[in-house]
Amino acid sequence: MKILFFSDSHGSTEALGNLTLRIAAEKPDLIVMLGDALYHGPRNALPGKYDAKKSAEMLNIYKKKIIAVRGNCDSEVDQMMLEYPIMSDYSTVWADGQRFFLTHGHIWNGGNVPPVTAGTILAHGHTHIPTLEEKDGLVIFNPGSIAIPKQENLPTYGVWADGELSVRSLADGSIYREMIRNIQ
């Protein structure tokens, strides 16, 4: 199974347009949205080509493939615009015998680990900083932000395919800063 992960689009049609190109190239079986879909929040500058309504339309195209969790900037108003559920604080996906705990990161994250078994991949966004590391028997995975990357990072997303987890450049799909790991 191939899964494409992204987070923190914050209503940027520019970022979602680039993501659409990556989805077409990657051809994922499942798309995981790790929160903060439409609103930029009071702490972030407006992202490139901010348009929450158009962003919702762009995301709804993939409504049958998306599993999403609620970010700290997501609200019931956002849910009214999106045609797939976004209001859960977490979800779990099993792929190729691997458990993924999906959350935005403002509640559960590498510093506040949920009660999960060793070997689980904790996938979250929120920080806008891509991460792929092992900690206390878990894999901590953050695909970064497609719209408002922080700490001098570029826009990124993530891919799970054939037992391999990676962070990739939104611009061209290349492996980002050697963030790739075999998970067996």
Where are these regions (language model features)?
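Functionally constrained cores in energy, signaling, and assembly domains
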Residues: 9, 20, 37, 55-56, ...
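Short acidic/glycine-rich loop or secondary-structure boundary segments that cap or lie
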Residues: 40-43, 76-79, 101, 110-112, ...
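Conserved beta-sheet core of the metallophosphoesterase superfamily
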Residues: 99, 106-178
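Histidine (H) residue identity feature
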Residues: 10, 40, 62, 104-106, ...
